[in-house]
Design a protein with these regions (language model features):
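Short, surface-exposed loop/helix-turn segments at secondary-structure junctions
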Residues: 231-243
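Membrane-embedded segments
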Residues: 58-154
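Conserved catalytic scaffold of divalent metal-dependent phosphoesterases
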Residues: 52, 97, 129-217, 240-283
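His/Asp/Glu-enriched short active-site or ligand-binding loop at hydrolase and phosphoryl-transfer sites
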Residues: 225-230
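Structural motif
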Residues: 61-63, 90-92, 122, 167-169, ...
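N-terminal membrane-anchoring alpha-helices
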Residues: 1-55
């Protein structure tokens, strides 16, 4: 029996259509999942490595970063913060996404006020904040946050016996606003009587420029944890600027760097890398 050539062509066309439909369906399912994951905020408790900040045992720091104009997740984060009752709160930059127009700054101020009513709150700026710096600084100030932009504050926690430590907030590295010499002490000046020092730096690569300064722990965001992490691949698809520290605690020389995956995202969503806020406890 001879098969008609048009029958073969119809069969091949049918297979192509089925394959195209399957690809479209899988793509739609993947996009839906990535959107769902990107809006499923996690509350994660992290214990710092032993001895990373001497003298501050028991300190509880709530870490938030990279909101990227996502007000609903900021509202969820504020609710989580109210339940966590930390000793202090730090925001590590990128309140907005710089190419998105923001007309509801008052709503962000209200949520930042919720956060700062829980505990003393501090912030540094991220790369997306720089183009909107006046707006961002207003939101932070009216929201009750102390902005540390290449400046430092001396903090004491009554619950811990008012032991004083230094909190440094650096400007953004990528945007050329990174000036540790304005707020940090050279290593040799503190060798005999070092004060516990925690650094807020939106970009964790800032650690590489602090070799001449004394510090104990850096808190950073910026990476979004890689945002898209494929199974069986050690490097996230969206690894930021070749960064090797994507999330969690990482040793660096004799210090520690903690990187949060952050709250918001840019692009299609998240995969295997959900958003988070973190409650860090110093052991």
């Amino acid at each position: 029996m001879t098969t008609h050539p048009f029958s073969n062509k119809r069969s091949q066309l049918r297979k192509l259509l089925y394959a195209a439909a399957a690809v479209i369906l899988l793509g739609s399912l993947l996009a839906s999942y990535m959107h769902w994951e990107a809006n499923h905020l996690e509350f994660n408790e992290n214990t710092a490595p032993a001895g990373c900040v001497p003298g501050l045992s028991g300190l509880r720091i709530l870490v938030l970063s990279d909101i990227h104009t996502n007000l609903p997740l900021l509202e969820k984060a504020a609710t989580m913060a109210e339940q966590a009752r930390p000793d202090m709160i730090v925001f590590l930059g990128d309140l907005y996404t710089d190419f998105l127009r923001v007309t509801n700054a008052g709503d962000y101020i209200a949520q930042m006020k919720r956060l700062s009513s829980v505990a003393p709150a501090y912030a540094c700026l991220g790369n997306h904040d720089m183009a909107l710096a006046d707006n961002v600084e207003r939101v932070l100030k009216e929201g009750g946050f102390t902005l540390l932009r290449n400046s430092a504050a001396f903090v004491s926690i009554p619950r811990l016996g008012n032991v004083e430590f230094k909190l440094v907030g650096l400007g953004d590295l990528r945007e050329g606003d990174f000036f540790p010499d304005r707020c940090m002490s050279p290593r040799e000046l503190e060798e005999n009587s070092p004060m516990p020092t925690i650094v807020l730096s939106h970009n964790p690569k800032g650690r590489e420029l602090l070799g001449n300064y004394r510090w104990d722990l850096m808190l950073s965001g910026h990476t979004h944890g890689g945002q898209i992490k494929l199974p069986f691949f050690s490097t996230p698809l969206l690894a930021s600027e070749g960064e090797t520290m994507h999330s969690g605690f990482h040793p660096y020389e004799d210090k520690q760097v903690f990187v949060t995956r952050g709250i918001g995202y840019i692009g299609p969503g998240r995969f295997n890398c959900p958003p988070e806020i973190n409650l860090i406890t110093i052991p």
